Amino acid sequence: MSVVKSIELVLPKDAVYLAGCIIEGQVVLTLNSTLVDPIVKVELVGRGYVEWNEETGASRDYSREVICNNKADYVHKTKTFPVEDNWLSAGSHTFDFHFNLPPRLPSTFTSKIGNIFYFVQASCMGREHILAKKKIYLMVQGTSSIFHSEKSLQNPLFVEAEKKVSYNCCSQGTICLQIQMEKNTFTPGERDIFTTEINNQTSKCIKTVIFALYAHVHYEGFTPNAERRSRVDSSELLRQEANTHITAFNTTKIVSTFHLPPVLSVSGSGSQDSEIMNTQYELVSTVHLPWTLTSVKAKVPIIITSNPVDSNQTAAGCRTRAPLPVSPDQQN
């Protein structure tokens, strides 16, 4: 029978930690029998990595795939708990701990190409080897180092896209698509409310309008020969489909709301994760025209920002609640 019955980490459930916050928790170690010379410790670790395959040499009549990758270490802190008289009796023992997150950290992130992850790990070691350990992954929201002026935060936005279309062999018309927003700068978890106006100057009916929020991630990596490479990958974060009935030569307005995820990478190269990746966001409204085999799209750049933690905030005050992340170990 093992000396250690269990080791557990006690942390606030479903918490999202802002960069610069304090992480408070407990390690609960339960022993079946007395343990001599134990080492009980807890670690806070934050890392990021990107990796993808890239074809090279196509212009030289040969091609081969090379692996491009990059990595970053964001935080690694360790606390070893003092043990009185260097032994622990059978039963449960509780150890309190806290860690200060650095003020500049990227947000938790996962994709097929890259991951940014954070975890707290508790362990108990005997004289020669690890007897037990426990790991919990954290959700961390990064903060912005580049702040946008009050004017850019408040100015309403208006975007218009117009397309002339041909249909039924010799018929022609125009579709005009407009998006209006009170602002285009948001924080994670906020509501994005926007109005779309569709002016249908054709003799056909428009039945479907699709709204989507995209993240365009620019990854930075290196080949085995230390040559810098980059790659851009886009993903759809949110999507809504409006089943409309916009009749011929008519105009319709649609008011939509997106509830942004509670954790998002902040926009642009001013973020801490910019050494391996940076993210841009875009809201796209699309009117599909199946009778012309084409579509009309209007695009609005979206800025995601997050203010640094106030020095007066308590540990509980700089946390929110969100679904737990999937660990990188579970994704592979």
Swiss-Prot record:
Cell location: Membrane
InterPro entries for this protein: Arrestin-like_C, Arrestin-like_N, Arrestin_C-like, Arrestin_domain-protein, Ig_E-set
Location, primary (coarse class): membrane
GO CC term (a single one): plasma membrane
Span list, region Disordered: 311-332
Keyword set, alphabetical order: Differentiation, Membrane, Spermatogenesis
A Pfam family per the record: Arrestin_N
Keyword presence, Membrane: yes
GO biological process, one term: protein transport
Entry function: Plays an essential role in spermatogenesis. May be involved in the anchoring of the sperm head to the tail during spermatogenesis by affecting SEC22A-mediated SUN5 and NDC1 transport and localization.
PANTHER family in alphabetical order: ARRESTIN DOMAIN CONTAINING PROTEIN, ARRESTIN DOMAIN-CONTAINING PROTEIN 5
Similarity-based family: Belongs to the arrestin family.
Stated name of the protein: Arrestin domain-containing protein 5
Species of origin: Bos taurus (Bovine)
Gene designation: ARRDC5
